[in-house]
Regions:
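Short glycine/proline-centered loop/turn elements that form peptide/ligand docking sites
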Residues: 93, 116-117, 137-140
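Conserved acetyl-CoA-binding loop-helix of GNAT-fold acetyltransferases
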Residues: 79, 85-100
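Intrinsically disordered, low-complexity, positively biased terminal segments
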Residues: 1-2, 135-185
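Alpha-helical elements of the RecA-like P-loop NTPase motor core of helicases
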Residues: 15, 118-119
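Conserved active-site tyrosine of GNAT-family acetyltransferases
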Residues: 121-127
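A conserved beta-strand-loop-helix scaffold within acyl/acetyltransferase catalytic domains
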Residues: 6-9, 14-78
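Residue-level detector of high-confidence beta-strand sites
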Residues: 57, 130-132
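Conserved GNAT acetyl-CoA-binding A-motif
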Residues: 100-113
Length: 185
């Protein structure tokens, strides 16, 4: 199997990103198209390539503000079946976090798709539980509210807490238990 190479996404990657998204998550074309229309920018996504196609992807979406601190959200981390176990998602996640911090974001959060992934986000990306799923607290741009409406109600199958990692020196104490409404779950 070919060596993995990592880079930022490009406009021309959208068909392959869509293919990988459908393959891993099974979402329909309307949902994926709405995400790309509402929230995606090439610089928000990192990919791994191998064998001439995308092997893994992850998105880090800036925009939320929690008690005056800028936040970003890791979303849709996905690795194609043949490339799993090669640490592609971990490397993409770490690069997304580093890029967010380099751009001035104070903390990066995510809502794991299922309880079993919480340990992965803790051990691989250094995240810990911080925000409550749903409810008031964190402020979001209008585009996030629009995509959240497209997503519908929160899934009872996702964890009740979002996991996060702060930039060095950021105190997360005042944020503990703050509500994070726009989870796209």
């Amino acid at each position: 199997m070919s060596e993995l190479s990592f880079r930022l996404s490009r406009e021309r990657d959208v068909p392959e990103l869509t293919r990988l998204w459908r393959e891993v998550f099974g979402d329909d074309e309307d949902f994926i198209s709405e995400f790309f229309r509402s929230l995606w920018r090439p610089e928000y996504c990192r990919v791994a390539e191998a064998d001439g196609k995308l092997a893994a992807m992850g998105f880090c979406l800036p925009g939320p503000v929690a008690n005056g601190l800028s936040c970003a959200y890791i979303y849709a981390m996905a690795t194609a079946e043949p490339y799993r176990g090669r640490c592609a998602a971990q490397r993409i996640g770490l690069e997304l976090i580093r890029g967010a911090f380099d751009s001035g974001v104070h903390l990066v959060a995510t809502l794991p798709a299922e309880e079993s992934l919480c340990r992965w986000y803790e051990s691989r990306l250094g995240m810990a539980p911080l925000f409550r799923k749903g409810g008031p607290g964190v402020e979001f741009p209008q585009s996030w509210h629009e995509f959240s409406r497209f997503c519908g109600e929160h899934s009872p199958e996702t964890p009740d807490m979002l996991w996060a990692i702060p930039a060095p020196g950021v105190d997360t104490g005042p944020l503990r238990g703050l509500g994070w409404e726009c989870c796209f779950d």
